[in-house]
UniProtKB/Swiss-Prot annotation:
InterPro entries: UreF, UreF_sf. UreD, UreF and UreG form a complex that acts as a GTP-hydrolysis-dependent molecular chaperone, activating the urease apoprotein by helping to assemble the nickel containing metallocenter of UreC. The UreE protein probably delivers the nickel. Belongs to the UreF family. GO terms for cellular component: cytoplasm. The keyword Nuclease does not apply. Keywords: Chaperone, Cytoplasm, Nickel insertion. HAMAP family: UreF. Its main location: cytoplasm. It comes from Ureaplasma urealyticum serovar 10 (strain ATCC 33699 / Western). This is Urease accessory protein UreF. One of its GO terms (molecular function) is nickel cation binding.
Length: 235
């Protein structure tokens, strides 16, 4: 039986992953706007293909694998290794806009989390960012808070995957444009058809060889976005 505190922790998780949580995700397409401009993404089906590319490459080998690794490191008190993940995931990003966008979102998450929760590691993370010892990353911040809230690993992975994809889908729906109901149908399909496979893949990856491993296509689109004179999104 779940305790009252467990329900409150679950509500906290729902709050921080809500689309209205003010961390700035509404400003980013992470390269998909380039595909929209080139008419590679123009309807619901083509958007799903682009989102699957993002989910199976950058999100899987970056954020989700980082969360998985932090859940392994923190119980062993390997704190310095967690800060190394922040460094690694920042250095591996080739596209400047995407790298800076992730950094801004991560820093905002750390700032707001510290205003809402009493978590020593997040306080330390904020100080490291202030001292320029860390950059700030959404996956690192989320993993630290999820463990503070006693959220299990799989729930944390599914939740981060959902919140990231839902926010990105809503942004792309505005850009194409598609109707809001169509956007919800896309999110629903992604959840029920593809999420299980992606989460299963996380557990089969090796951190040393697979972390931040990407195919070049999406990163090229993200770098091309930097030279786009008229755009809706910062990345």
């Amino acid at each position: 039986m779940m305790l009252n505190s467990d329900y409150l922790n679950l509500l906290d998780l729902m709050q921080i992953t809500n689309a209205n949580f003010p961390i700035g995700t509404f400003s980013h397409s992470f390269g998909i706007e380039t595909y929209i401009r080139k008419d590679i993404v123009f309807d619901g089906d083509s958007l799903i293909r682009a989102l699957l590319l993002y989910m199976n490459e950058q999100l899987l080998h970056g954020d989700l694998l980082a969360i998985y690794q932090i859940f392994k490191l923190l119980p062993k008190q390997k704190i310095n290794a967690i800060w190394e993940i922040d460094q690694m995931i920042n250095f591996q990003g080739l596209a400047r806009e995407t790298r800076e966008g992730q950094r801004r979102i991560g820093q905002q998450m750390v700032k707001i989390y510290n205003e809402l929760f009493d978590c020593e590691l997040l306080v330390e993370y904020a100080q490291r960012i202030k001292d320029r010892k860390s950059y700030g990353n959404p996956a690192v911040a989320f993993a630290l808070l999820a463990m503070h809230l006693k959220i299990d690993l799989k729930t944390a992975l599914y939740t981060h995957l959902y919140s990231t994809v839902a926010a990105l889908t809503q942004n792309c729906v505005r850009a194409i444009p598609l109707g809001q109901v169509k956007g919800q149908k896309i999110i629903h399909k992604l959840k029920h058809v593809y999420f299980d496979d992606i989460i299963d893949k996380v557990f089969s990856l090796d951190f040393k060889t697979d972390f931040c491993k990407n195919i070049p296509g999406l990163e090229i689109a993200q770098m091309e976005h930097e030279d786009t004179p008229v755009r809706l999104f910062m990345s």
